[in-house]
């Protein structure tokens, strides 16, 4: 086992804080409408330019192992916020840095770290309550566009595209983002269906960068039972190979020998294939398989109907223009099903919605209608160069996630103002002791950090802006960094999804609390140069006389 390097107390915390600051300082320059770009070097291809906080965070790896631990913990804040809310990663990073900085100062001054953490947790839950109660629902398409615009760093075209897409497929519909070959960004609505089952093996992945499986012009086998052996399917698989088209298997499960055989065939390149579990459970699974069959123009292979795998022919399978599979979701786009049959199926499900008395069943049936009728909207992002397209696609992804979050939990005042207004709810909050009160004050101070950073990125003194907003009794009063004006943020259209603001604070406080309470750090000692050359023969001199 390699020797370990151990750091304690102040030395450990200082090293960690340095790492936190390096990562946060690189990420926070992107915050706000006047945030700057960060250029990321790639080992192959052109450098990538981005304003996406989590993309910047993911690239950072520090040489000093102790500093790197601090950086990796804050990277975790950005990643978690991105996974939960899809946006707000830079805000979360700025909040985490502010809490850690103040917390470390207090620990160095002799405060109890555990009490500080308890104070931070108390304050965070109080502020989260305030954000939730301040949220109001999204009223119309214009507000959806405003949320998207803010998240896309002020580009109104992106906000409008997302609002249009949401209008076309509804809030239940599925929206995906792709790169366009041309200069324009356009929105297409394609008939399609998405369900929450991912690939059964990562070996099916065709795009390792995104860890997705993309099948173009695919054939789809729908099987109601488990597949544990492929022997009955051999004639069918031979027909599929002859057709040259990729195959998607949707079954209750594909396990053991069957899965191993598919993976081996995929790796050898003989068969373009992927397998996913069927969505739903019990009777609902049967119904959803039937939905997919109607959408793709195929049949469900069911033993109840006397169908055996041995007798299945290729014309009994469904087909779709494109299938995209991630580890969690499968999207079938442009199925070959007849329009009249799809409409009849939708009408049938709508009748069931009217008849059902269970709220849960009604919700699930409505989801099925959305998947059959709503389709998939595809936003194709264009640009002059590949670098520009990738940068814009990052922003469209963020904006899309933000608008979804806004529809889920409502909107609050944007530009960091919601956090400052929520801080007023901490005024009467008392901890069990003085150290906990200091923890509460750490959060109170940290809540101003995003607004200050937005102002500073716009070239304005952050403390002056924060002071003005703190003094105002109008909850919507704020600073529009785009126009450098003070006023009603709702009228300016500067709004944030409540879910994004809430998640950013919760994740930041959670990780910052862990960092503050760290007392020791352990890392591998760096290997000494030339240590790998041991065991060779010593001096070889004097062997010349052996001839």
UniProtKB/Swiss-Prot annotation:
Keyword flag Isomerase: yes
Catalytic activity: ATP + H2O + a folded polypeptide = ADP + phosphate + an unfolded polypeptide
Top EC group: isomerase
Molecular functions (GO terms): ATP binding; ATP-dependent protein folding chaperone; isomerase activity; unfolded protein binding
Stretches for region Disordered: 528-547
Gene Ontology biological process: protein refolding
Transmembrane segments: none
Compositionally biased residues, Gly residues: 531-547
Keywords: ATP-binding, Chaperone, Cytoplasm, Isomerase, Nucleotide-binding
UniProt binding sites for ATP: 30-33, 51, 87-91, 415, 496
EC number(s) given by UniProt: 5.6.1.7
Pfam entry (one): Cpn60_TCP1
Any single GO CC term annotated in Swiss-Prot or TrEMBL for this entry: cytoplasm
Keyword Cytoplasm in annotation: yes
Principal localisation: cytoplasm
Compartments reported by the entry: Cytoplasm
PANTHER family membership: 60 KDA HEAT SHOCK PROTEIN, MITOCHONDRIAL (PTHR45633)
Subunit details: Forms a cylinder of 14 subunits composed of two heptameric rings stacked back-to-back. Interacts with the co-chaperonin GroES.
Free-text function comment from the UniProt entry: Together with its co-chaperonin GroES, plays an essential role in assisting protein folding. The GroEL-GroES system forms a nano-cage that allows encapsulation of the non-native substrate proteins and provides a physical environment optimized to promote and accelerate protein folding.
Protein family: Belongs to the chaperonin (HSP60) family.
Protein name: Chaperonin GroEL
Lineage of origin: Bacteria, Pseudomonadati, Pseudomonadota, Alphaproteobacteria, Rhodobacterales
Gene field: groEL
């Amino acid at each position: 086992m390699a020797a370990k390097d151990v750091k304690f107390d102040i030395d450990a915390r200082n090293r960690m804080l340095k790492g936190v600051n390096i990562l946060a300082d690189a990420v926070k320059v992107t915050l706000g409408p006047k945030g700057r770009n960060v250029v990321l070097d790639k080992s192959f291809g052109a450098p990538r330019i981005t304003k996406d906080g989590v993309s910047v965070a993911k690239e950072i790896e520090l040489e000093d192992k102790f500093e790197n631990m601090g950086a990796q913990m804050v990277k975790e804040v950005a990643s978690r916020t991105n996974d939960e809310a899809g946006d707000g990663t830079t805000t979360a990073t700025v909040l985490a840095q502010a809490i850690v900085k103040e917390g470390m100062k207090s620990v160095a001054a002799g405060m109890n770290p555990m009490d500080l953490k308890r104070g931070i947790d108390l304050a965070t839950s109080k502020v989260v309550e305030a954000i939730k109660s301040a949220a109001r629902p999204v009223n119309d398409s214009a507000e959806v566009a405003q949320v998207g615009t803010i998240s896309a760093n002020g580009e109104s075209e992106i906000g409008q595209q997302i609002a249009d897409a949401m209008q076309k497929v509804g809030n239940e519909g599925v929206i995906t983002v792709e790169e366009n070959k041309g200069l324009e960004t356009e929105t297409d609505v394609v008939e399609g269906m998405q369900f929450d089952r991912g690939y059964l093996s990562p070996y099916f992945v065709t795009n390792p960068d995104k860890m997705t499986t993309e099948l173009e012009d695919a054939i789809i086998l729908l099987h109601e039972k488990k597949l544990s052996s492929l022997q009955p399917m051999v004639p069918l698989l031979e027909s599929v190979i002859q057709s040259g088209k990729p195959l998607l298997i949707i079954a209750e499960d594909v396990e053991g020998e069957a899965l191993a055989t598919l993976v081996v065939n995929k790796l050898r390149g003989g068969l373009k294939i992927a397998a996913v579990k069927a969505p739903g459970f019990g009777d609902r699974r049967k119904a959803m398989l039937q939905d997919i069959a109607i959408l793709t123009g195929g049949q469900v292979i069911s033993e109840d109907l006397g169908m055996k795998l041995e007798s299945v022919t290729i014309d009994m399978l469904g087909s779709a223009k494109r299938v995209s599979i991630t580890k969690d979701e499968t999207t079938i786009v442009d199925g070959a099903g007849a329009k009249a049959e799809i409409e009849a199926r939708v009408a049938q499900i709508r009748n069931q919605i009217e008849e059902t008395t269970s709220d849960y069943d009604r919700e699930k049936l409505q989801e099925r209608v959305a998947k059959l009728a709503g389709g998939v909207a595809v936003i194709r992002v264009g640009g002059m160069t590949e670098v520009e397209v990738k940068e814009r696609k990052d922003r469209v992804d963020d904006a899309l996630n933000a608008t979804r979050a806004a529809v889920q939990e409502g909107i609050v005042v944007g530009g960091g103002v919601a956090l400052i207004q929520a801080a007023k709810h901490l005024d009467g909050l008392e901890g069990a002791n003085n150290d906990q009160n200091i923890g509460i004050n750490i959060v109170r101070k940290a809540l101003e950090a995003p607004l200050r950073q937005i102002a500073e990125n716009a070239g304005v003194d952050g403390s002056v802006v924060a002071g003005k907003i703190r003094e105002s009794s109008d909850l919507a009063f704020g600073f529009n960094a785009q126009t450098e004006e003070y006023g009603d943020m709702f009228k300016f259209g500067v709004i944030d999804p409540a879910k994004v603001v809430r998640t950013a604070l919760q994740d930041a406080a959670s990780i910052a609390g862990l960092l503050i309470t760290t007392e020791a750090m352990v890392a591998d000692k760096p290997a000494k140069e030339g240590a790998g050359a041991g065991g060779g023969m010593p001096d070889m001199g004097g062997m010349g006389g052996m001839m």
